[in-house]
Regions:
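Short Pro-Cys-Gly-centered "Cys-loop" motif that presents a nucleophilic cysteine in a tight turn
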Residues: 1-62, 70-315
Length: 315
């Protein structure tokens, strides 16, 4: 039942940045009529003004939208509820329809400010290319994107270009600077095509985008200092997000055990069944729900089944 489905992991705190995404119910083309896209863009700018959001990038596609948004106040959920609810009311009134136009609340990935946030903005700006709506050389023509606004003489006050430009080689907010930025996007599009989407594919999955240090800090906030960080199932979230949190918790526990056993994780022997590795694996299996697959990969112990065999011999 829908009522029992877990909600996605989401933290709200001052100055947090997010990659927010939602799709039309049954993947229907909500924004294909120009009026629907224009109405959503209007609601988006109204939401930014009402909730004080700083909008780094957005793209309104045929059946979904992407936002790279910074929230000076911890109000993402309230703002998204207003944005989607207001647009849905106007959408249904315009079409004489009823029901939910979106497939659910929304998905929001935490994004580390700076380089990671700029990468998300590039990903968002390149959405029309990946969707084969137009080629990279015509990207500035796509109307329902922050890139289109950045190229205009006047833009909404909520749009902020500093991070996008600074992390693209320190470009200036000028006509020349934006021309260089669109050239840079064309290069990224070509690289992404060669790698079959691998470069940008991770920017819409999981629950956090950023460095390991940033992920660790969010994990601390999420678990509120609880030593039993494995109780993450209670927090809900999609499968990829839960798995990412599990692995972060296992890594944290492994480091603590290694310190207690005086084992240097950076200088483990190559031997798959080295005593140091087996002791670490045994301690992890005794105190966590760690998988053999994770231990085998993290400690270079060969096949997952080998981990249990090595631990049994130790016992």
């Amino acid at each position: 039942m829908l009522a029992s489905m877990p909600r996605k992991l989401r933290l709200e705190f001052p100055d947090a940045c997010y990659h927010a995404i939602n799709r039309g119910n049954y993947r229907r083309n909500l924004f294909e009529p120009q009026g629907a896209a224009e109405a959503f863009e209007t609601c988006l700018f109204e939401a930014c003004a009402a909730f004080g959001w700083r909008l780094h990038a957005f793209a309104i596609m045929r059946n979904h939208f992407h936002l790279a948004v910074e929230t000076p106040e911890p109000n993402l959920s309230d703002g998204m509820k207003w944005l989607q609810g207001t647009w849905a009311m106007r959408f249904n009134r315009y079409r004489g329809a009823t029901g939910r136009p979106f497939q659910g609340r929304f998905k929001a990935l935490h994004v580390e400010p700076g380089h990671a946030l700029a990468r998300v903005a590039h990903y968002i700006h390149l959405n029309p290319v990946r969707a084969k709506i137009l080629g990279a050389e015509r990207l500035p023509e796509f109307r329902w994107s922050s890139l289109w606004w950045y190229l205009q003489k006047k833009r909404p006050e909520c749009l902020v270009a500093e991070t996008v430009l600074a992390e693209s080689g320190g470009l200036a907010d000028t006509k020349t600077g934006w021309r260089r930025y669109t050239d840079y996007l064309a290069v990224l599009a070509e690289e992404d095509s060669k790698r079959r989407g691998e470069k940008f594919g991770r920017l819409s999955r999981g629950w956090v985008i950023g460095t390991e240090g940033f992920k660790a800090e969010l994990h601390r906030k999420l678990t509120r200092g609880n030593a039993d960080a494995e109780r993450i199932e209670l927090l809900g979230g999609d499968r990829a997000a839960r798995q990412q949190l599990r692995e972060e918790a296992w890594e944290k526990k492994l480091r603590a055990i290694a310190k207690e056993l005086r084992v240097d994780l950076g200088a483990l022997p190559a031997q798959k069944s080295a005593p140091e590795k087996v002791r670490l694996a045994a301690a992890m299996k005794a105190s966590t729900s760690v998988s053999n697959g994770w231990l085998a990969k993290r400690l270079a112990m060969g096949e997952p089944a080998s981990v249990s065999q090595f631990v049994r011999r130790l016992r």
